[in-house]
Amino acid sequence: MTHPVIPDILALAQPIAEDLGLEVTDAVFQTNKRPPVLRIDIRNLQQDTSLNDCEAFSRSFEAQLEESSLIASAYVLEVSSPGISPYLATERDFIAFKGFEVVVTSDNPHQGQSQWQGSLQGRDGEAVYLSIRGRTVAIPLTVGLTVRLPH
């Protein structure tokens, strides 16, 4: 489950990333750690993401975050490149992996099922679409989906 502060964090982070030619690919606030850890994953849109990209984003973002007071207590900020994640999250991921075999799991069962494996056909605002044994199956986003590449 996404921490409630994440949408505000993303709203703050995305313009900073865009100004630097970067894209925010993920944000996680791990409050189970002491101090809590805010992890932001970024990707350079033109080339491989470098340490300089992470450092530039970190400096700009941290200054804005401190000014915003979104996080009231001490925290650790980690900025990194996502590398190749097995999880599909962004629209770019779903376009890049169209036709690839994926595994979809849901938090809540849909039609008595919580896991599907098939060829990714796409995603829209309503569902993720898989081809399973030649048949297109729509799995609604409302059941809480995780989409990943198979191991």
UniProtKB/Swiss-Prot annotation:
Signal peptide: none annotated. CDD domains: YlxS_C. This is Ribosome maturation factor RimP. Belongs to the RimP family. One of its GO terms (cellular component) is cytosol. The keyword Cytoplasm applies. It is found in: Cytoplasm. Keywords: Cytoplasm, Ribosome biogenesis. Required for maturation of 30S ribosomal subunits. One of its GO terms (biological process) is translation. SUPFAM superfamilies: YhbC-like, C-terminal domain, YhbC-like, N-terminal domain. The keyword Cytoplasm applies. InterPro entries: Ribosome_maturation_RimP (IPR003728), RimP_C (IPR028998), RimP_C_sf (IPR036847), RimP_N (IPR028989), RimP_N_sf (IPR035956).
